[in-house]
Amino acid sequence: MFQGKCAFFDETVPSALIALWQLHNGEAKFLAEGYENFDYAFSMHLRKHVRLPNYKSVQCRSPWWIAEQVAVSRSKSYVSEPVIHLNVMEPLYVDHRIRSVYLQPLPSTLSFLNGELP
C-alpha cells in the first residue's frame, strides 16, 4: 500500500496516522515545506498543500481523520481518491482494492453516532 514511500508530516497529524504509515513500510519525516524528496504530505489543515511541481498531498479532517490523496496532473486538474479512513484506536482492516485502511473507532464514538447519549 505505502511500501517504499516517503511522507512529510506536520505538527497537526496524529501519531496514530504516522504509526500506520510506518507499519506499511513507509518512511516518515518532519521537514519544512518545500523539501522535495517525499511522495506524500500530511496535514490536518484543509486545502494546505506542499507547493511542488509533482506531489501527492493527503489532508486529514477531524474527528475521523479522513485522508484523501490529491494527485495533481500536468494539466492542473485535480483527482481525489480515498487513501486512509483513520478513526481513533485499533486497526480494523485494510482494503487493498481501494487502497484504504480503516481504524476502529472508540465504542463511545459509535454510540454517539447512533444517536445515543455518551
From Swiss-Prot:
It comes from the Eukaryota. One of its GO terms (cellular component) is meiotic spindle pole body. Keywords: Cell cycle, Cell division, Chromosome, Chromosome partition, Cytoplasm, Cytoskeleton, Meiosis, Nucleus, Telomere. GO terms for molecular function: protein-macromolecule adaptor activity. It is found in: Cytoplasm; Nucleus; Cytoplasm, Cytoskeleton, Microtubule organizing center, Spindle pole body; Chromosome, Telomere. The keyword Protein biosynthesis does not apply. GO terms for biological process: cell division; meiotic attachment of telomeric heterochromatin to spindle pole body; meiotic telomere clustering. Involved in chromosome segregation. During meiotic prophase, connects telomeres to the spindle pole body by forming a bridge between the telomere protein rap1 and the spindle pole body protein sad1. Interacts with bqt1. The bqt1-bqt2-sad1 complex binds rap1. This is Telomere bouquet protein 2. It comes from Schizosaccharomyces pombe (strain 972 / ATCC 24843).
